[in-house]
Amino acid sequence: SSATENQNAADTQPSTTQSISTLARQLADSASRAEARDKTLTRSELGDKARRLLSQISGDSYQAGKAKHDSEVPDTNDPVLLARAKQATEFVNRSSNNGKEKNPFAGLSREQLANIVYDDSGTYTVNERRAASMESDIQEEAWRVKVCAQAMDEYNRTGKLTNFFKSVLDHFKELPAIEQAQYPKDYAADLQSKIDLDFNYRTHQAEGKDKDPMSLIEMLFEQSPQQTNEP
């Protein structure tokens, strides 16, 4: 009945609101910790820390502790946090669960996701951090597909990739510091030099007339951190 539906909606609303407010509070705390971390570590130290933290949620190290990670629950009685941790574990194991699970961190910004992925305070379970990393990878891949299509269009129209390089540089500058630290030190400067050069890859005989633009695009992306999550 209509009354029953209204009651059900009323019953679920507080839970949804509580879930959002709990995550918002945790994200604010994570952002504060990230800001303090970024101020105390050099770029090199930040990159090393990032790689160490990523090894906890991907690769052989993660797989070796898979059973432990899948059974991990937050040290709390909060039903919202317990449910989210369970959802994250179901999501990272979705290949064996018909792929119907939703990522609890879907739709968060890259900065918010990074603040979860690289938070080693114990606020989030390993699988929650992995789920956040997977969402970040999805967003990165979607951006790459879009920018590559734009790059090919630019090349076909003008013979150049200048606007592509600008897009990549803008994207890099928007990344959290701990993600920027995983790129080569001269990554931004190299992009800026390409932008300043405004090179035409079809007409410049000295540097690769009719050079395949995809090889240039792929070479540039190879310098970025590899996505960490196995299929």
Residue ranges and their predicted role:
Residues S1-P231:
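Type III/flagellar secretion export determinants
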